[in-house]
């Protein structure tokens, strides 16, 4: 037989190839079945706007549902030695928690834990209490349960001492509470189904418990995600000596909502309960004579202890219009301290999501939509983060499982007009400072506080300053250094910053004159003494259009702050000063668009 023609050989090979092609997926199929799953989808933040999201729920969801299912709830109670923690109180106390495991633990897989540690389980007056730990908490609990258990995470809900079924003293953010929290983190990290890595999540008090845990530095605590979380009690209730109204009753209000008003409550009472009742009024009235700073409040400062003791990662979530847990919990501290910047400079992995929302979660659209003008209202259209569940998923994947790309240590900051951008740090470290000599502005009034001779109303001072020739992007913590004269050892100034053209509120600052040097330490002030009040504004990220100037409205009090304890007898005379603000010039390269849709629930 003669040689095969080249065209015939080619046709034969092509025919063979097409015959074998359908079988190609079968070769090595047993190996593919045992190979690891493809890594989850981690979209770039700039691409998220183009993706399909679950828009119709009350909270955000991950892009891809996980393969596992939650198992039935389990509960645990374990004993903690409290013999050395309280002057009086039980020598041992119990921590109670409930937890849900993903179905892959039935195959022996070890999983990380996401926990919410709270006083809010079975919280409230008898008959109207919130759910117990064995019921998935509304909002934050459902968010974790639905998003992360299917991806192989355990979820735990823990009650602090003296609440729900945890015994012992309700030691409001004190050392006893911290010990119970630390013990819970240790327990969760040591179970035979745990991979040893614990992350904490939650807002407000449930953010405070995260800092309490970090202060005691369990090796199992890998990351915290405080959402408007309290970092220390004194700066929560006081800003440069100005007292919030709740500072007078905070401890007792919590205690009254955690007891059942029966004989079992005796174990919940410890000396700090009584101390807490008096701490607020004494600090408010005595200022520099306050005896509580070195004990009661110092014990309840956690962020400084975590800074010394712990080496985990922090995803900081803060509402820039949150006047419940103010931004200075993140961007403040003792004189010379900015906790966000200091943690970053010390080498911690720190990321921030800083929206113009109030005391809410990034995806809590039902609350976002109710914000007023000057308090985030101008940013509502771009505020809700429907990608929050995915963003946090990528954080947990890396820090609790060690998979996926390392999240960038940046700050996602929203400007007051709604625009989001990426900053390496916030406040930006490349900002330039602009200063305005208030003597060049129009001043109305010369005293703050006291009673006006005309009309009997409170005296106020306003400064209205000329407009700028270009847009001014304020980004950081402006300062107001006021030249004042005191009438006695007391008095207070609340300063609201406004757009002079529109009256739009941009931010505020407050200070008790006894804290004129800034920080936490008061000094005695004498009648007639001239001094400079070194006021610092809460964090602001806002645009002031070209041609617009600033207006400062100085009153005795504002927002939720009390008037000074000295009442009408302590007016402060204002003799001018300097307003300074950090401003940045951005070209738009770091602006990103968040996922939004006309079909979304918030629209």
PLM feature spans:
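N-terminal cap/lid segment of alpha/beta-hydrolase-fold proteins
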Residues: 56-109
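Cap/lid segment of the alpha/beta-hydrolase catalytic domain
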Residues: 109-189, 365-379, 502, 559, ...
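Secretory targeting signatures
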Residues: 1-38, 603
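Accessory cap/linker subdomain of secreted extracellular hydrolases
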Residues: 39-65, 133-134, 138-145, 150, ...
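Glycine/threonine-rich phosphate-binding loop and adjacent beta-strand/alpha-helix elements that clamp
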Residues: 38-63, 72-83, 388, 400-603
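Residue in the alpha/beta-hydrolase core beta-strand immediately N-terminal to the catalytic nucleophile
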Residues: 197-199
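Short beta-strand/loop motif that positions the catalytic acidic residue
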Residues: 310, 316-318
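A catalytic-pocket lid/entrance helix-loop region that shapes and gates access to the active site
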Residues: 176, 201-270, 320, 327-334, ...
């Amino acid at each position: 037989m003669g040689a095969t023609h080249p065209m015939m050989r080619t046709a034969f090979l092509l025919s063979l190839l097409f015959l074998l092609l359908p079988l190609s997926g079968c070769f090595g199929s047993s190996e593919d079945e045992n190979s690891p799953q493809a890594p989850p989808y981690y979209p770039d933040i700039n691409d998220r706007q183009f993706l399909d999201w679950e828009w119709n729920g009350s909270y955000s969801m991950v892009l891809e549902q996980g393969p596992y299912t939650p198992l039935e709830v389990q509960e645990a109670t374990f004993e903690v030695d409290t013999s050395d923690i309280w002057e009086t109180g039980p020598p041992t106390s119990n921590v109670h928690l409930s937890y849900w495991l993903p179905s892959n633990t039935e195959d022996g897989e070890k999983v990380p834990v996401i926990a919410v540690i709270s006083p809010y389980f079975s919280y409230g007056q008898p008959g109207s209490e919130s759910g117990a730990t064995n019921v998935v908490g509304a909002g934050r609990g459902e968010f974790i349960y639905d998003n992360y258990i299917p991806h192989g995470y355990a979820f735990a809900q823990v009650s602090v001492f003296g609440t729900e079924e945890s015994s012992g003293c309700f030691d409001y953010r004190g050392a006893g509470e911290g010990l119970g929290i630390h013990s819970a983190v240790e327990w969760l990290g040591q179970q035979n189904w745990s991979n040893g890595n614990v992350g904490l999540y939650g807002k407000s008090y449930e953010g405070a418990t995260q800092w309490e845990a970090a202060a005691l530095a369990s090796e199992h605590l890998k990351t915290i995600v405080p959402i408007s979380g309290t970092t220390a009690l004194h700066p929560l209730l006081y800003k440069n000596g100005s007292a919030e109204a709740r500072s007078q009753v905070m401890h007792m209000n919590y205690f009254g909502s955690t007891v059942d008003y029966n004989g079992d409550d005796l174990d919940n009472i410890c000396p700090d309960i009584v101390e807490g009742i008096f701490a607020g009024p004494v600090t408010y009235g005595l200022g520099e004579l306050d005896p509580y700073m070195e004990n009661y409040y110092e014990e309840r400062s956690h962020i400084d202890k975590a800074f010394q003791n712990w080496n985990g990662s922090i995803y900081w979530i803060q509402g820039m219009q949150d006047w419940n847990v103010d931004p200075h919990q993140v961007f403040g501290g003792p004189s010379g301290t900015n906790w966000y910047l200091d943690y970053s400079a010390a080498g911690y992995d720190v990321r921030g999501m800083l929206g113009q929302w109030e005391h809410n979660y990034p995806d809590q659209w039902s609350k976002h939509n109710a914000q007023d003008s000057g308090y985030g209202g101008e940013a509502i259209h771009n505020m809700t983060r429907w990608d929050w569940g995915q963003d946090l998923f990528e954080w947990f994947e890396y820090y609790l499982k060690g998979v996926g790309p390392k999240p960038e240590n940046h700050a996602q900051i929203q400007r007051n007009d709604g625009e989001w951008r990426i900053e390496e740090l916030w406040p930006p470290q490349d900002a330039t400072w602009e200063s305005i000599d208030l003597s060049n502005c129009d001043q109305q009034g010369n005293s703050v506080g006291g009673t006006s001779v005309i009309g009997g109303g409170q005296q106020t001072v306003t400064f209205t300053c000329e407009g700028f020739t270009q847009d001014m992007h304020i980004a950081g913590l402006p300062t107001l250094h006021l030249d004042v004269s005191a009438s006695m050892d007391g008095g207070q100034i609340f300063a609201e910053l406004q757009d002079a053209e529109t009256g739009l509120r941009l931010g505020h600052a407050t200070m008790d004159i006894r804290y004129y040097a800034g920080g936490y330490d008061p000094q005695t002030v004498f009648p007639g003494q001239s001094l400079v009040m070194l006021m610092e504004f809460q964090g602001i990220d806002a645009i002031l259009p070209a041609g617009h100037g600033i207006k400062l409205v100085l009153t005795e009090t504002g927002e939720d702050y009390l008037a000074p304890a000295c009442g009408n007898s302590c007016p402060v005379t204002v003799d001018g000063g300097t307003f300074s603000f950090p401003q940045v010039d951005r070209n738009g390269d770091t602006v990103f668009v968040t996922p939004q849709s006309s079909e979304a629930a918030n629209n």
